[in-house]
Amino acid sequence: MTMKKLVVLISGLLAAITTFAQTPQLRTEIFDLIDFDHPGLENVKALHQNGQDAEAASALLDYYRGRKGIVTATIRDLSKVKISPEEKKWADEGLEHTFFVHYGYQPSYNYGEDINWKFWPVKDMELRWQLHRHKWWVPMGQAYKVTKDEKYAVEWTKQYIDWIIKNPYDDPDKENLRFSWRPLEVSDRLRKQPDMFMLFVDSPAFTPEFLTEFLVNYHKHAEHILANYSEHGNHLLFQAQRMIGAGCFFPEFKRAKTWSDSGVGILNREINLQVFEDG
């Protein structure tokens, strides 16, 4: 075998491994996290109790695709979703792994065909932190809704799974952990991911398996904030606000009320500490 053929073979194998790694898996632990007595989940409950978890995940996806009356602060009506030229640029560059992270560093950096979430082209803490806010993902969802082009949904699901795999909560790389799981970034993802959910949930790329990956990951984010609230200041207020949103957008979780109640309690306490008599 010539060196050229060997390089082609190795490249093909690496591409296949990456594709497999980005394939969502059925996360059966989701059935321990949701409240089967929530209205509308009767079929999900029956299928799970019958040992049909794949079918239960499909039923759960059907439930979410048909769910009414729950929206986000930024997306009230999916039929009115728009995208600016700047947002479209972020979405299109995101397809090529050129990620808009920070206005202070333009043009945006490319993070490689096999995304390197640890890439730190300029040693500015904000550049590394804000990478994990995924600012180009909501624009990808807007682009999907406006253009109906599945390439945005397909790429978003791949990047979402890739991030989960490469940035685990129990990451032994402690330096990476302090960027990827800093509470402010975690709360920012809590805020934005319901928008992504609304924008992408009807896509064929949003499979039942992906749904379970998404929900388990989202649950982990909320629990992380609950255990790691900032001590004071604006970070704490952001986190509390976003925990309220998490519980309200996903009331199907057993812990949803705990999340929302924690946020309400903090805001009620902090308004007396952070706002003086003169306003």
Which ranges hold each PLM region?
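Extreme N-terminal leader/anchor segments
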Residues: 22-102
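Aromatic-lined, polymer-binding surfaces characteristic
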Residues: 109-111, 123-279
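Bacterial Sec-dependent N-terminal signal peptides
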Residues: 1-23
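Basic side chains
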Residues: 4-5, 27, 76, 133-135, ...
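Short alpha-helical hairpin
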Residues: 99-117, 131
